Amino acid sequence: MYQTTAALRSAFLEYFRQQGHQVVDSSSLVPGNDPTLLFTNAGMNQFKDCFLGMEKRSYVRAATAQRCVRAGGKHNDLDNVGYTARHHTFFEMLGNFSFGDYFKEDAIRFAWEFLTGTLKLPKEKLCVTVYHTDDEAFDIWNKQIGVPAENIIRIGDNKGAPFASDNFWQMGDTGPCGPCTEIFYDHGEHIWGGRPGSPEEDGDRFIEIWNIVFMQYNRQSDGTLDPLPKPAVDTGMGIERISAIMQGVHSNYEIDIFQKLIAKAAEIIGVSDLENKSLRVIADHIRSCAFLVADGVMPSNEGRGYVLRRIIRRAVRHGNKLGATDTFFYKLVPTLIEAMGDAAKELKATQTIVEKALKAEEEQFARTLERGLGMLDAALADLKGDTLDGETVFKLYDTYGFPVDLTADVCRERNLKVDEEGFNAAMAEQRSRAQAAGQFSADYNAALKIDTATDFCGYTELAAESKVVALYRDGESVDAAEAGAVLVVVLDNTPFYAESGGQVGDKGQLLAEGVEFNVADTQKFGQGIGHKGQLALGSIKVGDSLKAMVDKKLRHRTELNHSVTHLLHAALRQVLGTHVTQKGSLVDPERLRFDFSHFEGVKREELKAVEDLVNTQIRRNHELNFAEMDIEEAKAKGAMALFGEKYDSKVRVVTMGDFSIELCGGTHVGRTGDIGLFKITSEGGIAAGIRRIEAVTGAAAMAYVAQQQAELEEAAALLKGDVASVVAKLKAQLDKARQLEKENAQLKDKLAAAASADLAGDAQEINGVKVLVKRLEGVEAGALRGLQDELKQKLKSGVVLLAIGSGDKVNLIAGVTQDLTGKVKAGELVAMVAAQVGGKGGGRPDMAQAGGSEPAKLDGALASVVPWLNERL
């Protein structure tokens, strides 16, 4: 009845709904409330604050089918995926939770009732474990549920310390903790393995299917356990494991979801062996990759994006092993959506974006893979021993972008090891070099330790009466300074905005009678705000009163550019997709720069749509609203938070109509209409998966448009027409140029044919083979290929080596007729000559090209050709 995975999921949630639980949707794979966590890896993650007593919800019982990823960081199953029956990068965790409501008795009863009642699993196939001192749980299992005592196994502290046990759960060194009870299923005597707690427990016969954690203590720093006033329950059952049991199979990869994905992958790639482990890897990895992209993660070189990139590339590499010659991975997404059923709502909504992102990464990696595998194969061919050295692994990673885990995978398949210590040492050395290169002589942010807090009044004021609370000169605290001194001035309150969130610091002046300090930049130093600049007039000392005056014009222009980045961010998400997230920005008075995640170049029509959408919002003249609220409330309202930014519990939310809502501490215009005009000046890629837009606003945008118009009019004049006819006239000119190029190429071919007739007569014979070695004058490098083709046809059977040498450049081409390539290879010949003139090259056995940088050595190099050929002909 509940044999399909989809039916099992529904049955679990419905059972707990009937037991008074609130069915809660799976949270994102990107944790929203835990910066310490790379990915959501357990059902309890989204309820962490509930368990800690920091959040109260409208329900005290919950049930979920939570999407989880374990790859990277502490919980990393990547290396085992595909090679074992139960390791995955992606899995679904069925869970029921109690926040101070029911406890051990009900939690145990619910689990047993669902397994033996709803799913009708044979009771004799089940055994349970409890923590060795948890007599309460033992008695519930034995006396209330009726599990025989011999099927209840007490597990002690088996990890070398008090409470360090498979059956004692701890959130950390301190905090909530408690014993747990686990339910195991016996797959039968035909599979090796023993009951939990036995020497053979690592076998596959007895498989844990449900873990029930009883959070009943609060662990203190001294190790003592204090009872919690409201104990809680956290449970988890992997849907893949229970599906395997219900479907009568042993390996998770044999269940319906995986079988559909494996069959589809085999069909796309064109393989018949459905037991191949590479198909398992691909089937697992498409689940984690597709859902990660759907939840907003894009392939990149850092953080979550890098883990995603590694998983995609591992899948592609296994496809390559199976013989895939074209992109295949993204084509599994429709099958995944169908197989996951109701659990794929978010994936279905973002299907197009997911497919595009996976395809783009696959195409990019195809180039890296071919080159990297060639390098790795060469290194392994020369390997002495059974361990690939760390330097080679690092070179593959650093120079060729070949992931370390793929190198380890290839070595593993060949029963070889990887020198991880050597790789880590090479990586550490590179980091230290980078850190040394990034050190500056005067790092004020590191040097100034300012304890004083500065009040910022610059949201509403551009001038303020302030008092000097600290002065710094050359990184040292001073009490006073005279004219000419370069200083950092710290005030008790200031209207100057300190650089933050991409917005540059304000400029302006600090003034008093006979005193003028020109502020060139404003920076944060802890809780203090430092005004960096030069004392132009008079003297100042700690305790002086000054008037702080922000440069209004510069601030206003900066505000135009900052406000429009919010509109740009929202527009990009509307036009390109909700996967777009801000990756960095620079906002100054002259321009704005906005970096964002996207897996391919932005098309011209998409860029125009973004620009038009932003300008539409400017014309709508939305009033900007600013509000302070709790961060969770802000996120609930849909406010965009920037990944990597740290926010206080209270945040400032900036809203522009119903178009944009973001967390932001920067300064802004009053209405979007103040921006006037938005104009994109450039768009391009700055890193894999990261794009950059540069733009201008207001008067700068008007000036940019005027400049473009002037250049267009100048182009029209050069083409002897008006602006309206520029495109047509330019097309005509390009067509004419292409025709002339075609005619020029034909003429060169004729000249080459004529020249070849003359040159063929200069061929000499070596052991009956015609050989032509010639240094040419007055011939362009582009004509060499056609000329050697003509000469080979004229000679019918022979070897040709042509060279051009002038200035500091040498061009070489070698040609060998097909009947002689068994004796002489053009690539070897041209490489031999190139090596003598400071160059290198290669190519096919019948034709190869090379370059060099030492024309003075060319004649000597050409003289070596005949002796070289004598040895081979």
From Swiss-Prot:
It comes from Shewanella amazonensis (strain ATCC BAA-1098 / SB2B). This is Alanine--tRNA ligase. Consists of three domains; the N-terminal catalytic domain, the editing domain and the C-terminal C-Ala domain. The editing domain removes incorrectly charged amino acids, while the C-Ala domain, along with tRNA(Ala), serves as a bridge to cooperatively bring together the editing and aminoacylation centers thus stimulating deacylation of misacylated tRNAs. GO terms for molecular function: alanine-tRNA ligase activity; aminoacyl-tRNA deacylase activity; ATP binding; tRNA binding; zinc ion binding. Its main location: cytoplasm. Zn(2+) binds at H562, H566, C664, H668. The keyword Glycosyltransferase does not apply. GO terms for cellular component: cytosol. Its EC number is 6.1.1.7. It is an enzyme of class 6 (ligase). It catalyses: tRNA(Ala) + L-alanine + ATP = L-alanyl-tRNA(Ala) + AMP + diphosphate. Signal peptide: none annotated. It holds the Pfam family tRNA_SAD. GO terms for biological process: alanyl-tRNA aminoacylation; negative regulation of DNA-templated transcription. Its cofactor is Zn(2+). PANTHER family: ALANINE--TRNA LIGASE, CYTOPLASMIC, ALANYL-TRNA SYNTHETASE. SMART domains: tRNA_SAD. InterPro entries: aa-tRNA-synth_II/BPL/LPL, Ala-tRNA-lgiase_IIc, Ala-tRNA-ligase_IIc_anticod-bd, Ala-tRNA-synth_IIc_core, Ala-tRNA-synth_IIc_N, Ala-tRNA_ligase, Ala_tRNA_ligase_euk/bac, DHHA1_dom. Belongs to the class-II aminoacyl-tRNA synthetase family. It comes from the Bacteria. It is found in: Cytoplasm. Gene3D superfamilies: 2.40.30.130, 3.10.310.40, 3.30.54.20, 6.10.250.550, Bira Bifunctional Protein, Domain 2, Threonyl-trna Synthetase, Chain A, domain 2. Binds 1 zinc ion per subunit. Keywords: Aminoacyl-tRNA synthetase, ATP-binding, Cytoplasm, Ligase, Metal-binding, Nucleotide-binding, Protein biosynthesis, RNA-binding, tRNA-binding, Zinc. Catalyzes the attachment of alanine to tRNA(Ala) in a two-step reaction: alanine is first activated by ATP to form Ala-AMP and then transferred to the acceptor end of tRNA(Ala). Also edits incorrectly charged Ser-tRNA(Ala) and Gly-tRNA(Ala) via its editing domain.
